[in-house]
Amino acid sequence: MYCTHLRMLQLVVMATLWVTPVRAGTHCRYGCRLNNMTITVEREDCHGSITITTCAGLCETTDLNYQSTWLPRSQGACNFKEWSYEEVYLEGCPPGANPFFIPVAKSCDCIKCKTDNTDCDRISMATPSCVVNPLEM
């Protein structure tokens, strides 16, 4: 009888641990999402700062301890799902200056990391996770 209850408890704990990371990811503050960012733009005739909407955040990544041909590694990168170019004029530009055309994110998604246009390096283990919010420390 005792062994049966112990076995059942082990199964419940294992099931809980299996589901926990999936549920934690859906409420993570560091997940892939739209984010406002201020950048500096310049050219010969003018320069200044603008605020754009871009994608930022962490994506789930699978990195196995062993190499396998039937279990591929996948590394997601937070990137634009839908975007468009917006015309931006800077205050410091002379009258009649050509505008800047800036890509602006409309929605974001975790997609397979494309090394031709994305930095796919791993993030340091010192990076805050969903469990620890640096603002609450």
From Swiss-Prot:
Disulfide bonds: 32-78, 46-93, 55-108, 59-110, 113-120
SMART domains tied to this protein: GHB
Residue positions with a glycan: 36
Keywords, ordered alphabetically: Disulfide bond, Glycoprotein, Hormone, Secreted, Signal
Signal peptide: 1-24
Primary location: secreted
InterPro entries from the UniProt entry: Cystine-knot_cytokine, Glyco_hormone_CN, Gonadotropin_bsu, Gonadotropin_bsu_CS
GO molecular function: hormone activity
Pfam families: Cys_knot
Gene Ontology process terms (BP): G protein-coupled receptor signaling pathway; ovulation
GO cellular component, one term: cytoplasm
Subcellular location: Secreted
Domain of life, source organism: Eukaryota
Recorded family membership: Belongs to the glycoprotein hormones subunit beta family.
Subunit structure: Heterodimer of an alpha and a beta chain.
Function: Involved in gametogenesis and steroidogenesis.
Protein name stated in the entry: Gonadotropin subunit beta-1
Native species: Coregonus autumnalis
